[in-house]
Amino acid sequence: MEELQGYLEKDRSRQQHFLYPLLFQEYIYALAHNHGVNGSIFYEPVEVFGYDNKSSLVLVKRLITRIYQQNYLISLVNDSNQNRFVEYNHNNFFXSHFHSQMISESFAIIVEIPFSLRLVSYFEEKEIPKYHNLRSIHSIFPFLEDKLSHLNYVSDILIPHPIHMEILVQILQCWIQDVPFLHLLRFFLHEYHNLNSLLITQKKSIYVFSKENKRVFRFLYNFYVFEWEFLFVFIRKQSSYLRLTSSGTFLERTHFYEKIEHLKIEHFVVVCRNFFQRTLWFCKDPFMHYVRYQGKAILASKGTHLLMKKWKYLFFNFWQYYFHVWSQPYRIHINQLSNYSFYFLGYLSSLLLHFSAVRNQMLKNSFLIDTITKKFDTIVPVIFLIGSLAKAKFCTVSGHPISKPIWTDLSDSDILDRFGRICRNLSHYHSGSSKKQSLYRIKYILRLSCARTLARKHKSTVRTFLRRSGSGLLEEFFTEEEQVLSLIFPKTTPFILHGSHRERIWYLDIIRINDLVNHS
């Protein structure tokens, strides 16, 4: 009867941390811009615009005091907009921008502490050495190669966003029971929600969701996704259990949801009583796999199309009743794997079917056996990559290379280094593609864009510049994969490099997707 209660409180009981006093500790802000925090488990370094990247305890204390003043943040924007050409008011407008960064950065740093400690302790308990190796994005693809070839249907899920910031705070409240800290966070989100509304009417940028402030909001969003995945795992386990229980046992289990008390998710229990009991046993599927990436998710199953539709509407009800998030049916697409290609982490993935006939000879009789083998295939989406290059001003939308005027002030070595780094990163990331020849076009665009940029800097034509500099200037853009592999594998290693342009090599040191392959 207490299975759900124990499952939901299993991890939350550890989160009895008091975070509010940490806002007034000097060492927190010394760690904030330390190299150790820059290499944090969760995030990349955040660059604060117009600031020397040194947080101050005194400034934070003053900001916390002032933020409780009525309409303090909005008044700064109003004062600055009355006369933009007055230096004092311009400083006030910049101060509102800077204050939002300071407060959000402080929240993000402190709220990460208990969860990073919990993650480290988890791997220590499981005795998993070097858990940072598990962060590789490419580790997902070998998993898909092993699992998807045996499945039939896949659902592309676009995870909905919460319509109100209070939902995020309430979810966090179930895990961190620190009233002052949550109250300040709620007040901060409320004030900047009003500030955003004011800035939208004035056709200005939204500071809260800007690049400088994305750290704390990315944490809250990821935590919201983690919460519904946490409950989804429970639903999945119950659906797997139901296929092994008798009908009498199932009728007894339908009442244990109503008997649970003293939980922080009473609303979830009410939802279960309303629709969960009627739909759960329809969704039993022993072969189901779930992968989430960049605000999207993939749910693959060996079941029928009807079963996938039942899971689809269960998600809709779950989001609506528990998270108060309204989701449209177009957010989930159900497709058959054998006839569908889906874009996944910079690759165009599909399930290829290979038909073959085997002649079997038995005594005087012979007969043919038709066999079908499935293979998970990943190719480079050249059209999407060209679109990303066009957006970054390396080429036109049709793929015609152009110069990069903003880089002409750099030295020749810096220009070559930047273009070469982009080219190597793309080749490194797409090393698992089954058709790497398509990368040659991307390399050609970058090579010619680099030549045009250097020629523009020296006020010359591309042909004249290359004739004067030598043909070997841009050879690094066409570094063969064999040369890269020869640096990784020792000569004594029996590794066949011949034909490696057809080999699929997944590098397990890539922890985040490259900006140029992020098309979402």
UniProtKB/Swiss-Prot annotation:
Keyword vocabulary terms for this entry: Chloroplast, mRNA processing, Plastid, RNA-binding, tRNA processing
InterPro entries in the record: Domain_X, Maturase_MatK, Maturase_MatK_N
Compartment list: Plastid, Chloroplast
Main localization of the protein described in the UniProt heading: plastid
UniProt entry tagged with the keyword RNA-binding: yes
GO-annotated molecular function: RNA binding
Entry's Gene Ontology BP terms: mRNA processing; RNA splicing; tRNA processing
Cellular compartments per GO CC: chloroplast
Domain of life per record: Eukaryota
Keyword tRNA processing: yes
Family from the record: Belongs to the intron maturase 2 family. MatK subfamily.
Entry function: Usually encoded in the trnK tRNA gene intron. Probably assists in splicing its own and other chloroplast group II introns.
Name of the protein: Maturase K
Gene assigned in the entry: matK
